[in-house]
Curated annotation (Swiss-Prot):
GO terms for molecular function: mannitol-1-phosphate 5-dehydrogenase activity. It comes from the Bacteria. Its EC number is 1.1.1.17. Belongs to the mannitol dehydrogenase family. Gene3D superfamilies: N-(1-d-carboxylethyl)-l-norvaline Dehydrogenase, domain 2, NAD(P)-binding Rossmann-like Domain. NAD(+) binds at residues 3-14. GO terms for cellular component: cytosol. This is Mannitol-1-phosphate 5-dehydrogenase.
Length: 379
């Protein structure tokens, strides 16, 4: 089986690309980093350093790479592969959608009606459905109808912490990852036979898993980063080692967890164990996870479907406590990082228009009581 994977960054190489290659799939990476592309094509392999209680290096083979700016190369791949995955970041999906539309149209014209499945592996809710909508903006109604027949747009939830690591001179493509990984896909959205990929779990209730991960791992990770930054530490593992930080992170995940328990009938004890597992992952002594990396892009993280506002809206829906989630929103608004364009934009907007206007603009919150709480805590 042949797959095209967009994004040869740490997640692409250390998570999705690895799972595909481990299952005997030939993976062609598409990326804009020509140095990395050349390294993949020359070395035809790279190491994945898995760090934890039993650290080891596993080698990924059966790979090639193309430059995603080379439209012809991308189109040729899309015309023939059976699976396409992405790990490019939510913001990039919209940029590559016109090229995907052109490539899928070319596949149609070439007469290839074999099933093709596309899975966006991004930190967002129903990322593939979003990607599909962006692709379809560039296609005619008749093209859309034809593509619907043989292309599956499969939503997924992905979870693996893959922080940047020191360059290994002997293997510049080597990537460091934690032991834990979770890739859950919506089995109802595939076209044709579902590919047999070790480590890819199937479900018909994806939103429960998407929100479990978003409301727990992502929410907790972000709170750890903000509190760690306030405490003056560099790494997430240092932040979570501070008792008051760990307590606040856990309390926030418990607030968002109460929404999940109510919404999806999760077992409270099982969810409490899931929270403990995540706290242990944050404390992994082998992972150098920078608080600025985790805290970056506050505008995206304050959006209505993301890790702070979505669980907060859930607490309002069910009449549940949300003190810690509100604190999280305040910390996101207070996040300052001169090297992060979103942080700069947010700070400037607050300076020009005030906190209440920023809350309304970026979060979509309409509950006046909560907006007032945020403003009071910010000032």
């Amino acid at each position: 089986m042949n797959a095209l994977h967009f994004g040869a960054g740490n997640i692409g190489r250390g998570f999705i690309g690895k799972l595909l290659a481990d299952s005997g799939v030939f993976v062609t990476f598409a990326d804009i980093n020509q140095t990395q592309i050349d390294q993949i094509n020359q070395n035809k392999q790279y190491g994945v350093k898995i760090v934890g209680d039993a650290s080891r290096v596993e080698v990924v083979k059966n790979i090639a790479a193309i430059n995603s700016k080379d439209e012809e190369a991308v189109i040729e791949q899309v015309k023939s592969v059976e699976l396409i995955t992405t790990a490019v970041g939510p913001n990039v999906l919209g940029f590559i959608a016109p090229l995907f539309a052109k490539a899928l149209a070319a596949r149609l014209e070439a007469g290839n009606t074999q099933p093709l499945n596309i899975i966006a592996c991004e930190n967002m809710v129903r990322g593939t459905s979003f990607f599909k909508a962006k692709i379809f903006e560039n296609l005619t109604a008749s093209q859309q109808a034809e593509i619907e027949k043989f292309v599956g747009f499969v939503d997924s939830a992905v979870d693996r912490i893959v922080p940047p690591a020191e360059l290994n001179e002997a293997d510049p493509l080597e990537v460091t990852v934690e032991e834990f990984s979770e890739w859950i896909v919506d089995k109802t959205q595939f076209k044709g036979q579902i590919p047999d990929i070790k480590g890819m779990e199937l479900t018909d209730n994806l939103m429960a898993f998407v929100e479990r991960k978003l409301f727990t791992l992502n929410t907790g990770h972000l709170i750890s980063a903000y509190l760690g930054k306030q405490a003056g530490v560099k790494w997430i593992k240092e932040a979570i080692a501070i008792d008051s930080v760990k307590a606040a992170v856990k309390a926030t995940m418990e607030e968002s967890g109460a929404v999940l328990i109510k919404r999806y009938n999760f077992d409270p004890q099982a969810h409490a164990a899931y929270i403990e597992k995540i706290l242990k992952r944050f404390a992994n002594p082998y992972l150098n996870d920078d608080v600025n990396r985790v805290g970056r892009e506050p505008i995206r993280k304050l959006s209505p479907n993301d890790r702070l506002i979505k669980p907060l809206l859930g607490t309002l829906e069910y009449g549940l406590p949300h003190k810690n989630l509100v604190n999280g929103v305040v910390m996101a608004l207070q996040y300052r990082n001169e090297e992060d364009p979103q942080a700069v934009e947010l700070a400037q907007f607050i300076a020009d228009n005030g906190v209440a206007a920023a809350v309304e603009k970026y979060t979509g919150l309409t509950n006046q009581e909560v907006i007032d709480q945020v403003v009071a805590l910010y000032n």
